[in-house]
Each structure stands twice: as C-alpha cells, then as structure tokens.
C-alpha cells in the first residue's frame, strides 16, 4: 500500500492553519503532533475501512486487557506505514525536526508489563494478518507523574494525556451503550484506535470505552444551585474510567475496581 507523503504534509499544514492559525515552523510540538496525527488518520481511512469490510461475517478474535501501552504512535505508525524516513525528510525540508515530538507523552492507558504485552499481541496479530480487535477502558489518567515536595517526599500527580488532544482515536457515539449497575447507570462511549500492520496493508482496531453520565445537563439541579450534586454525579459516572488500578484498600475502591472489570 502506498501513502502520499506530500499529501500528508500538505494536510498537516492546512490543519495547523485552520485550528491554530500557525505554520510548521511557528507551532508547538504538541500541536504539530495533533495535526500530523490527524493527517495520517485521513490517509489511512480507506485502508482501515477496507480492512473492516473484508472481515465482515468472518471469524475474528478479540483481546481483552485492563491496560494497553501502545508507545509513541507518531513514530510507530509512520514506521509501519513505511513512510517515517520520507516524512522526516519532508519536515526537515520545511525547517522542522521530527525529533521535537519525542517528548510528547504516550497514551496513558497502562503502567506496566501487562500493557506492553497487550500492545505486542495487537502488533503481532495485525502484521501476521490475524483479524484481532482489542478491547479495554479509555483511562483519562492511566499513568501518573511523580515529583518530590520540599520535604523530599514523593508525590503523585495526574497525567492528563489527552490535554492536547488525541489524534489517534475516533469517538464512535453511534456505538455507545448503557451499562447498568445495581445502583447506577452509565454510558460507555467507544473510541477506536487503528492498529497498523507492518507495511500498512492491514489495519486492526483497538476499541477503548469511556464512562460518561447518561442524559443531558441537569438544569433543574443547576437552577436550584445544587452544583455539588451535579459534580458528584459526574465524577461517580466518569470515575470508572478516570484511572487505572484505583486504591483498593477501602470498600469504595474495591467497588470501583469491580465496576471497571465488569463495565
């Protein structure tokens, strides 16, 4: 499969202008990553769609994991498509070093060997032509950052990996489903991420689910100034996919882990 690098770079420039009124040389690494990722997603869309259609009504395999560590997708995806060197050269010709994106955070969807193992299974399957789809949760804070306070104590900080956008996933609202627990109902919204096989001929899918509150904004509660209730309800629903492996030393923590494993 051949992908047009000039088109990808042109689309990246157009997206930078449209979204940020910037150019390749005036933008930030985060914005460049976001727009380049979107341009690549545009380029692979036909192949991704064809891969899905070719496997309709055929036997498929599914991989379930609590976590996935997919690595730096801008590099791995361009490499698997066979255009990493060409994109690097095209950016350099316009005064941009692709290495500037090396500090872009990985998708924080895991924190250990289990996540890397899951990613390796997906990579191996798609490169071998096996129709394997991955399923899991789309954590907002899958990992955490660490720092030391003034007393030298280690502190954990949230790692909001989607703060600058997530160009490698598509939200699929039409496939959202209700998940009913004994004491609450949430909406599970899927986000699809392409898993590109080496050579770019086949693309599988990693579908990650994000927990959200059902229904629309509660204006009645807002008008009566029950803002704490609104916030509490939101966190209770969205908290299921907030973080990987919540503290299970309390009853609430154990219940949250149970919800995650059954969602």
Residue ranges and their predicted role:
Residues 1-263:
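A conserved ligand/cofactor-binding region detector
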């Amino acid at each position: 499969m051949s992908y047009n690098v000039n088109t990808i770079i042109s689309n990246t420039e157009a997206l930078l202008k449209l979204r940020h009124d910037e150019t390749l040389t005036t933008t930030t690494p985060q914005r460049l990553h976001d727009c380049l990722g979107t341009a690549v997603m545009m380029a692979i869309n036909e192949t991704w769609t064809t891969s899905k259609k070719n496997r309709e009504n055929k036997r498929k395999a599914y991989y379930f994991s609590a976590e996935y560590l997919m690595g730096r997708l801008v590099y791995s995806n361009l490499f698997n498509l066979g255009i990493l060197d060409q994109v690097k050269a095209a950016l350099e010709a316009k005064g941009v070093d692709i290495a500037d994106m090396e500090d872009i955070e990985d998708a924080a969807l895991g924190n250990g060997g289990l996540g890397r193992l899951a990613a390796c299974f997906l990579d191996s399957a798609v490169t071998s032509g096996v129709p394997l789809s991955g399923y899991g949760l789309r954590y907002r804070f899958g990992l955490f950052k660490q720092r030391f306070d003034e007393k030298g104590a280690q502190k954990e900080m949230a790692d909001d990996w989607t703060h600058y956008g997530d160009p490698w996933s598509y939200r699929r609202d039409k496939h959202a489903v209700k998940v009913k627990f004994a004491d609450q109902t949430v909406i599970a919204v899927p986000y699809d991420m392409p898993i590109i096989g080496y050579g770019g001929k086949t693309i599988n899918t990693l579908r990650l689910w994000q927990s959200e509150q059902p229904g629309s904004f509660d204006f009645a509660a807002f008008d009566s100034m029950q803002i704490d209730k609104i916030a509490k309800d939101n966190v209770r629903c969205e908290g299921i996919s907030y973080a990987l492996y919540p503290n299970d030393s309390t009853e609430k923590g154990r219940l949250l882990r149970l919800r995650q494993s059954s969602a």
